[in-house]
């Protein structure tokens, strides 16, 4: 991976996969956007396909407005919404969430920079931080 000074980083995966825990640890000294907090700000709790596409666009726009690197953490169930991020981190720690509708719509990524399969990810956080400096 090349040196990146101003990267848009997507941490995505099923609910309960550890996205927020990982993203908060990664986002030290970076802008950080959590989907649940953004939904609260916009009072938008629409989880239909249209609502999820709107949320994906909103999250990407917020990341682009940030100065320097930004970490966004959300399910991002559709592969088409992941392509524009510089670094894509798939939290592939669980095969199913407790939300059956989300399980059905979640598309496995066609490409990701990192695939996290367990909660031992300190080395990946360090690698990303090193590339961003």
Q: Model-flagged regions — what are they?
A:
Residues 23-64:
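Conserved substrate/cofactor phosphate-moiety recognition/catalytic segment
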Residues 30-32, 86-90, 113-115:
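Conserved beta-strand scaffold positions in the cores of enzyme catalytic domains, especially
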Residues 18:
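Conserved glycine(s) of the Walker
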Residues 91-133:
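Small-molecule kinase domains that catalyze NTP-dependent phosphoryl transfer to phosphate-bearing small molecules
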Residues 11:
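Hydrophobic anchor at the beta1->P-loop junction of P-loop NTPases
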Residues 49-99:
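Glycine-rich phosphate-binding loop used to anchor ATP phosphates in small-molecule kinases
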Residues 1-6:
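Phosphate-binding P-loop
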Residues 14-15:
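The conserved Walker
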